């Protein structure tokens, strides 16, 4: 997977405010984590094999101090399959309204089939619990995306 994000404005703001932050890219299963106060996983866990997700969260838990936070932003699915289908259709309509063609939406969906494996919010919360996180809260949801915060 390749991607590029222009973080220059953020880096300038961070430097001005004297905020210490690391951004890294790599295989989280192979990366040694140092201690962080907050770790943000944005659209990451959904691409990790389901069998490896709990060990990734344990690894993150162990790299946080007591009171440290994980912020998890993920594409989700709904338990109710009818609702899930409706929300996905709403998401595709949203993408069309924002300039995506039906063909590009279809091609991306096909490319991500069996690669992006979303969980329900409850399944993600359960994974966090099994990794020993506490105070697990869903704090934002839009269509089939959710933001969850948890504390070590």
Regions found by a protein language model. Give the residues of each.
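A short glycine-rich, Lys/Arg-flanked "PGG" loop and its adjoining helix->strand segment in the class I
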Residues: 54-66
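C-terminal alpha-helical "lid/dimerization" subdomain adjacent to the S-adenosyl-L-methionine
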Residues: 75-131
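Core SAM-dependent methyltransferase catalytic element
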Residues: 125-152
